[in-house]
Amino acid sequence: MTETYIKNTSKDLTSAIRGQLTYDDKVIEKIVGLALENVDGLLGVNGGFFANLKDKLVNTESVRDGVNVEVGKKQVAVDLDIVAEYQKHVPTIYDSIKSIVEEEVKRMTDLDVIEVNVKVVDIKTKEQFEAEKVSLQDKVSDMARSTSEFTSHQVENVKASVDNGVEKLQDQKAEPRVK
């Protein structure tokens, strides 16, 4: 009599299934962008003229703006244009960026980061950077609020003037001017 043993392990099952896991560039760009949010001394990733203009017009900050990647089957290369904080040591910022990008991409995708190129396109104080983040949308909202307050005040003035005019007319109506 022959005995048959069936070995059922997850490794055997996965090795029998063929397929391929790939990542779109924007997925890796998003991982990199989110990973960079808490790097000390990194104020922002510069998305270029049009991305920056978009951010000035409307409050839409995409974590992918300014992050460019090249994704292969096993490796990733990353290019960044950054704004560094004034009086911070830029090589330390660069080392932090490389470390966190490599760690997060590897942890989430098993891809190896083989290159991280960083170009410092500007240096600003935190105050300068925050002041420049005020968008046109914010300015329009502030103007609308100010206009609304001014209009409300003017409406109250007009109501008071009309009420005074009505009272005067009623006083004049009570006594005829000519007898």
From Swiss-Prot:
Transmembrane segments: none
Region (Disordered): 147-179
Chain coiled-coil ranges: none
InterPro entries: Asp23
Compositional bias segments (type: Basic and acidic residues): 165-179
Record-stated family: Belongs to the asp23 family.
Protein name according to UniProt: Stress response regulator gls24 homolog
Protein's organism: Streptococcus pyogenes serotype M6 (strain ATCC BAA-946 / MGAS10394)
